[in-house]
Regions:
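Short conserved AdoMet
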Residues: 37, 115, 129
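A short glycine-rich, Lys/Arg-flanked "PGG" loop and its adjoining helix->strand segment in the class I
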Residues: 118-133
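A C-terminal cap/extension of S-adenosyl-L-methionine-dependent methyltransferases
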Residues: 3-4, 13-17, 92, 184-209
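A short His-aromatic
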Residues: 109-113
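Short, glycine-/aromatic-enriched active-site segment of Class I SAM-dependent methyltransferases
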Residues: 11-12, 135-156, 162-165
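Conserved S-adenosyl-L-methionine
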Residues: 172-182
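Conserved N-terminal segment of class I S-adenosyl-L-methionine
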Residues: 1-100, 104, 108, 118-121
Length: 209
């Protein structure tokens, strides 16, 4: 989750139980299962509040297959491991060595924050081992652009074609691409178009009452 929405939850435990975030964990589990190996080295770009890393260490059914996790985020101020990651082979930094190679890269809701998105994709490709896998999620459809995108610092939204073309241009082979949460599209469309939003809002992800 983006650090801008960090104050919307009281704890990491509360955050990882949000239905939106839990759904994303399914895709993380799926890519590890697809990779089908042990001693996996994972890099997460834009790790933010680290909910994905928390899941990988504490809740994923594939935790035993993971050798190391590196969380990268230029906005991280505290690079020490949190309590829940003290005994794990997990590290945090603001940038990654250009020589490091990963089996799996996670970049979930990250690409839209980068103006030169094609450059970022090439960098991520170069970080992957030859048989490595990259999991990307991005906000969909430019016509759903709203003040929430501005609040989060987005440059654009994508559709399947634009993301597919961008990935191929970066030298990546696309294995699977599809829309997540498509069942809420009509509601999101109406909310974006009918309700005014304050650009200083603290985000869409909030804890349940």
């Amino acid at each position: 989750m983006d650090l801008r929405e960090d104050k919307n939850f009281d704890s990491i435990e509360e955050e990882v139980n949000h239905w939106w975030i839990r759904t994303r964990f399914n895709y993380i589990n799926e890519i590890i299962e697809y990779y089908n190996s042990n001693n996996i080295n994972i890099v997460e770009y834009g790790c933010g509040t680290c909910n994905n890393i928390y899941h990988l260490i504490n809740n994923s059914p594939h935790s035993s297959k993971i050798n190391s996790i590196i969380g990268i985020d230029p906005n991280l101020e505290n690079l020490d491991n949190p309590v829940w990651a003290k005994d794990s082979n997990c590290f945090f930094d603001n940038s990654l060595s250009s020589t490091y190679k990963a089996d799996i890269i996670l970049a979930m809701d990250v690409l839209e924050h980068i103006k030169e998105d094609h450059t970022a994709l090439k960098e991520w490709r170069n970080t992957l081992k030859p048989d490595g896998l990259l999991l990307i999620t991005v906000p969909a459809f430019q016509h759903l652009w709203s003040s929430h995108d501005i609040f989060l610092g987005h440059y654009k939204r994508y559709n399947n074609k634009s993301l597919n073309d961008l990935a191929k241009a970066a030298g990546l082979k696309v294995i699977k691409i599809h829309y997540i949460f498509s069942f809420i599209y009509p509601l999101v469309y109406l909310l974006r178009k009918c309700l005014p939003r304050d650009s200083n809002s603290n985000g869409d992800l909030k804890k349940s009452n």
